Amino acid sequence: MTLPHLSAVLLSVATFLVACQSTAAPSLMPSTGEWPNEPGGFLAMTNQPWNDLANHGWNRRDSTDDRIVADADAPSSPGATLEYIYPAGFPGGTAPATHYFPLDGRKELFVGLQWKVSSPWQGHSSAVNKMQFLYAKGADVAMVMYGPPAGPFEIRVMPQWREHGGAWLTPNVNRRTLALGKWHSVEWYLKYESAYGAGDGIVRWWVNRELAGNYTHVRFPDDEGFVEYQISPTWGGVGDSKTRSEYFRFDHSYISVPGPEHE
């Protein structure tokens, strides 16, 4: 099973390639130590607090319904969170905004984010509510909040390259229903194969510090690694429309990679 409308994915790939050609990745920094499942020896590329819509090496595009808002329950910075607004009538197949960060060809990385979904939340009729993406030069992998329009919802991962074959990576360790209206800690680790075709690539993710999915025989594309990270929470699928105003919110967003001695 593949995510709907591959043509839209390919258009997005082409768009980000043009946008990132002149964008250099920043210097590495010491790990913050705030993410319990971050591998040892990793260094931070970014620890974005979301006190502005575009700073600290991040950029934005196609952004019409994003803003910085306070959230008293936010775990790290209650005075400032990034909010994506889905107003009543919002159509499927688009995101309220896209925020992106350059990765300069990484084959192993860790992502940590703090994320909240409004309550109530109207899921898309396709069951797909996309959260975040990692882009290589010809394909991407998406993390998705998956479930029917009224829920329940869980987090799944979909590698969208031909080597993978189109199957969902579903929670295979701990399967939990996501609570709406609450902040969640989401951690994501990916590592390319030791050699193309080896079949030993890794995709893992944790929800609220608990391992949800662990896949250690994942095929990856034959390329130079991930070149861009995106928060681009596309609703759907195509078709369908929001019947009320809802939101996604993000507090800190963190990305780290192996230090020189661990590469």
Question: Where do the protein language model's features map onto the residues?
Answer:
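N-terminal secretory signal peptides that target proteins for export/translocation
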Residues: M1-L3
